[in-house]
Amino acid sequence: MKSNWNYPTTMWVGKDRIKDLSNACKTLNINKPLLVTDNGLAKSQIVIDVLNNLKENGILVELYSNVIGNPTGTNVTEGADYYNKNSCDGVIAFGGGSGLDVGKAIAFMSGQTLPIWDFEDVGDNWTKADSQKIAPIIAVPTTAGTGSEAGRASVILNEETGVKNIIFHPKFLPSIVILDPVLTVGLPPKITAATGMDALAHNLEAYCAPGYHPMADGIALEGMRIINDWLLEAVNNGSNVEARQNMLTAASMGSTAFQKGLGAIHSLSHPVNALNNIHHGLSNAIFMPYVLTFNKDVIEKKIIKICDYLELNDCSFDGFINWILDLRKKLDMPHKLSEVIDEKDFDLDRLSKMALADPSTGGNPKKLTEADMKIMYQHSMSGKLFK
């Protein structure tokens, strides 16, 4: 299944393509990359082998491994300082969504003078950047979920405000992506499931977002079909390289498709990820049926089209909801937010305000108010779907 793609960027796909990483560096004239990853991966044999292979091929790689889950502005600033201190000339963003997001943001911020928050994805903020001082990026995902390797943004937590900000620039899109399923074979079932549901949320919300974008719609539909065919297999048989390859592909497709927009699944998720430190894929999985049933009157026709494309037994809105609920059950995922967040730690008013202000809110099929966010949170906590 090895192949080379040129959309949405250069993507080298297939088993053992990680061995081409030094060639990717040479293709981009990167002689001294900074490999950005988390501390756990940095100690793994995968990263040890990658670093050795790069050095054997004359690439003078440096390592930054302080990335944390739900990464912060401090992560980015520290990494950018390390990049400049060591005179690096490119970034290898290596890992799950956090490693990829921080790596991309380090490449971006290494040459900027304004603070990172000035580049939040609002209006034309991205035009404030000096685009000539953005380092080249190679992305190597080790999970199949965020699709950050195919995206033009990073999600970074502002520690002062407690808000997860989407930082955007067209040059966040990596120049080369390596999709090697072997790197995801060791993922535990729970992480495989959560990241897979993140990929589903991306494809699903992109398809349901309003606006005319047949290209994104087509990619999103096929992404959902791949997830339907392969997610359970990837979870139940993690050594199945074909399943892992397909899930990596579906994740990249989701990120490509959501250029069209996202929606309330993500709007509700980002605040609980920031304030309650809940895994993003897990929160997306929890919120999914509540948001879908809330939006039912404006998305029902689209949902039926998805059912038809996925060849579900029950091609109706309720049939699709039952498919989601059944999938979550098979993945051993919670039905209610209260199963992962204690009521005393749940600041409904603050979360609702943050959700409404989230950039993803604009892509929701139905215009939303703070009261809408509040009631969706309440239903998610109680486990009661909207009728």
Where are these predicted regions, by residue range?
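Structural motif
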Residues: 10, 32-34, 61-62, 89-92, ...
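Glycine/threonine-rich beta-strand-loop-alpha-helix active-site module
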Residues: 74-179
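An N-terminal, well-structured beta->alpha segment
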Residues: 1-64, 385-387
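C-terminal charged capping/lid subdomain of soluble metabolic enzymes
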Residues: 303, 307, 311-387
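C-terminal catalytic subdomain
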Residues: 262-319
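N-terminal small/polar loop signature for handling phosphorylated ligands or for N-terminal nucleophile
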Residues: 42-115, 233-244
